[in-house]
């Protein structure tokens, strides 16, 4: 049993999805005050203006949803990102990997990196459990979070618990993760432990705690998407690609055009257009107000619903893909 009271900082890697939400709610159930819990959202498309962000991979409503969630529960929220997000990294052609930035508690923004060796990608991350091939997870989430911890002096000489929502049920790869272990940022100068409190949970348990707290999850779940984070996740099944094509035809076409331009597909054998042709759109893909909600960067819906209004979303218990 992890003694939550002994940590100076508790951080939650918060995508806005069901599993990271369940991990946050678990902390509340254990008596941790919400103001002690920092929600860390790694923006896979980058963050901010002036070329710092794209709109290729994630839901436009996600940043606003995360802000509303944090505001409702009165928990601090900090964004972190690689400049230009996945799209800039994917389009690297004889250039260095972009810098990493993060928000500090005083409102300032820290930045590091961007001066590494020059290289070329010109292809999407590939479907693989190998992080060097599936570089989206490492370059846009894992490395970003680690840089934000290593470059903030407030963690030096302190004890930090970094919580993430991976579950064993998701894949054989994630089943091998340890529930509790030293984080990659742990050193003689700072103590950082990684804790996966929902690792052994079945999906039903995730929905049970969300129902009990009456949390209105991200609209993507109501459309029928079984996972959040990247709406254009490279592990998406045929139905997900068919749904994305219906929800955001222009965004889908941009991805298809990149596959043609690169001469490499996301899936090793099949282009996204063919995969979409083989799938069926989710139930909510014909609900235009719901689609508009998911695509709204100024999302302002409620986070807590009346008990009689909470219903399990269309995306529950669906095929979500993920690292094998």
Model feature map: region roles:
Residues 214-227:
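Immediate flanking context of iron-sulfur cluster ligation sites
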Residues 1-38, 68-84, 151-154, 182, ...:
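Peripheral terminal appendages
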Residues 1-213:
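ATP-dependent adenylation/nucleotidyltransferase module used to activate substrates
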Residues 134-135, 226-239:
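Local cysteine-cluster metal-coordination motifs and their immediate loop/turn environment
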Residues 198, 222-225, 247:
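Short amphipathic alpha-helical interaction segments
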């Amino acid at each position: 049993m992890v003694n939550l009271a002994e940590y100076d900082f508790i951080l939650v890697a918060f995508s806005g999805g069901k599993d990271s939400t369940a991990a946050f709610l678990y902390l509340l159930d254990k008596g941790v005050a919400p103001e002690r819990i920092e929600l860390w959202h790694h923006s896979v498309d980058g963050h901010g203006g002036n070329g710092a962000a794209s709109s290729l991979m994630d839901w436009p409503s996600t940043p606003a949803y995360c802000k509303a969630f944090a505001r409702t529960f009165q928990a601090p929220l900090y964004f972190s990102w690689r400049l230009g997000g996945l799209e800039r990294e994917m389009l690297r052609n004889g250039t260095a990997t972009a810098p990493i930035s993060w928000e500090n508690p005083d409102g300032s923004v820290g930045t590091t990196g961007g001066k590494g060796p020059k290289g070329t990608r010109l292809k999407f991350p590939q479907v693989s459990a190998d992080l060097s091939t599936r570089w989206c997870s490492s370059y846009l989430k894992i490395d970003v979070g680690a840089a934000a911890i290593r470059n903030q002096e407030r963690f030096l000489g302190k004890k930090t618990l970094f919580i993430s929502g991976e579950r064993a049920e998701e894949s054989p790869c994630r089943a091998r993760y340890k529930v509790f272990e030293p984080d990659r940022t742990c050193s003689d100068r700072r103590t950082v432990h990684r804790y996966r409190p929902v690792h052994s949970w079945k999906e039903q348990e995730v929905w049970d705690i969300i129902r009990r707290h009456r949390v209105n999850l991200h609209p993507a779940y109501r459309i029928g998407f079984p996972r959040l984070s990247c709406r254009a996740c490279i592990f998406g099944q045929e139905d997900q690609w068919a749904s994305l094509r219906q929800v955001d035809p222009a965004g889908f076409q941009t991805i298809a055009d990149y596959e043609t331009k690169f001469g490499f597909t996301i899936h090793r054998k099949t282009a996204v257009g063919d995969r979409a042709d083989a799938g069926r759109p989710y139930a909510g893909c014909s609900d235009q107000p719901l689609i508009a909600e998911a695509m709204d960067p100024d999302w302002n819906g409620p986070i807590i619903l009346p008990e009689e209004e909470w219903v399990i979303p269309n995306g529950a218990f669906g095929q979500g893909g993920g690292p094998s």
